[in-house]
Regions:
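Glycine/proline-enriched, intrinsically flexible loops and inter-domain linkers
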Residues: 1-111, 115-198
Length: 198
């Protein structure tokens, strides 16, 4: 299949069989293969690409307060992630997002946001950056919403990361065992906690 300019495998056919799905209103010929893939992840490990997700970085002294206003859920502490809906003032759903909080800003200081220090509210923590992940096909929709809501004083900077940032998702009971073979970093339960972000 393809979505938002990226081609992605929807399912994998057995060796020796043609990977063509017979589309029906019932279960297609892909059903058994998708079931086997799902069971493999549940019992062992699976990996899939998440590059096609929309990705945005927010920074500046007003970033936390801005995100706290447009997101319905709690903004996590540094090094943590949280799932949160984004709603309009009437409570209608704009998008279902994941927000991650980084510590001090990692990018070079530039533009009006970098010249502002401190913050007008107690909800500001100097130097924080935030990364939001959401539906890839809604990237432009999210961009328009963010732009409409951004303060005009330059206290918040929003950057669309697009395809510059690739992503992989690994899941299943053997996920940590695979990661241990790929890195010297501590990927134990204590070293890499659930919903951690570094």
């Amino acid at each position: 299949g393809d979505g938002f300019g990226l081609e992605a495998a929807l399912w994998f056919q057995q060796d020796g069989k043609e990977a063509v799905e017979d589309v029906t209103f019932g279960r297609s010929n892909a059903w058994d293969q998708v079931r086997q893939e799902t069971l493999a992840v549940r019992s062992s490990v699976g990996l899939w690409e998440t590059t096609g997700f929309s990705k945005f970085k927010f920074s500046g002294p007003g970033a936390r307060a801005y995100l706290d206003r447009i997101l319905a859920g709690r903004i996590p502490n540094a090094g943590r992630m949280a799932l949160t809906p984004m709603t309009n003032p009437a409570g209608n759903l704009i998008g279902d997002l994941t927000v991650a909080t980084l510590g001090a800003a990692t990018g070079a200081a530039e533009g009006p946001a970098s010249t502002i220090t401190g913050g007008a509210t107690g909800n500001t923590r100097d130097g924080e950056e935030f990364v939001l992940f959401g539906s890839g096909i809604a990237e432009r929709y999210y961009e328009r919403w963010f732009d409409q809501q951004l303060p005009t004083d330059g206290s918040v900077r929003c950057e669309t990361l697009g395809f510059e940032t690739a992503g992989l998702s690994i899941a299943g009971p053997n996920a940590r065992a695979v990661l241990e073979k790929l890195t010297d970093a501590d990927v134990s339960q204590n070293g890499m906690r659930f919903m951690a972000f570094t």
